[in-house]
Amino acid sequence: MSALALSLAMSSNHIAMAQNAVTGTPAAVAAKLMARGDAPEVVTSEMRVVRRNDILTVQSDLHNKGMTDRMVFYRYRWLDNVGNQIGDGESWKQFTLMGQGQQTLKGVAPHSNATDFRLELSFEKK
């Protein structure tokens, strides 16, 4: 098992690796993202993964390094131990990420079968 897989599987581990030179998003975090739309100034700087009461919980920090406000749509996709999606998926949530602002996104797995996740993001200029 790789160091990344171990860090994701263990409770209370932070995913913070070397910064990706292009986006500023750490490589381990970028592996968990699925993004639509163009927003190079929006960086997902850190993800915190915790298993509480056998339920996976994730917090993801987004930072808008630009001056333009962005409408952000997001949802977490929960996966089982072989990579299959669990359940029907979450509905999209939305918020405005102000220029030079930051926001923490929180997600809780629907049940204990979830062992992994992807954060899906979609961006629009406001």
Residue ranges of model-derived segments:
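Transition segment at domain starts
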Residues: 15-55
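Intrinsically disordered, low-complexity Pro/Gly/Ser/Thr-rich segments with frequent PxxP/GP/PP motifs
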Residues: 87-113
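Short, surface-exposed ligand- or partner-binding patches at beta-edge/loop junctions that are enriched
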Residues: 112-126
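Short beta-strand and strand-turn-strand segments in soluble, beta-rich domains
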Residues: 40-42, 69-71, 81-91
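Asparagine-centered strand-capping/turn motif at beta-strand->loop junctions
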Residues: 62-66
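Bacterial N-terminal signal peptides
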Residues: 2-11
